[in-house]
Amino acid sequence: MQKITVPTWAEINLDNLRFNLNNIKNLLEEDIKICGVIKADAYGHGAVEVAKLLEKEKVDYLAVARTAEGIELRQNGITLPILNLGYTPDEAFEDSIKNKITMTVYSLETAQKINEIAKSLGEKACVHVKIDSGMTRSEEHTSELQS
């Protein structure tokens, strides 16, 4: 059987992105924060280019799926806060801390490891605590946390 392939592509017009972002901002209260999720190379549209536009348009945060994506943004001059939505392996803790990438933490043990590495670097680590609120998508459960 002959396999027929159809070439596919995606194009992004940064002016349209800017227009859409500003329309969204106009619908929101002034104190609402916006996080531009640009994981997977901004879904194939070029993370650095999209991040530069979002930074210029004053979004509040950026989110990626891997440490390497956040480091690439830092290496290209992006200064916005960056949240890594994905799992950060132990060997990426130091790079995340040095590049001021907020790590998603799934367990108390991981938070403690990150804290020790940050102390040894003389830095503060930024973390985002993921809590299983009933969908069983993470290790940490609300019943295990102390107030």
Question: Residue ranges of each PLM-predicted region?
Answer:
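Short, basic/glycine-rich phosphate-binding loops at helix/coil junctions
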Residues: 1
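Active-site-proximal beta-alpha core segment in soluble small-molecule metabolic enzymes
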Residues: 4, 8-11, 16-19, 29-143
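Hydrophobic alpha-helical segments, chiefly the membrane-spanning helices
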Residues: 145-147
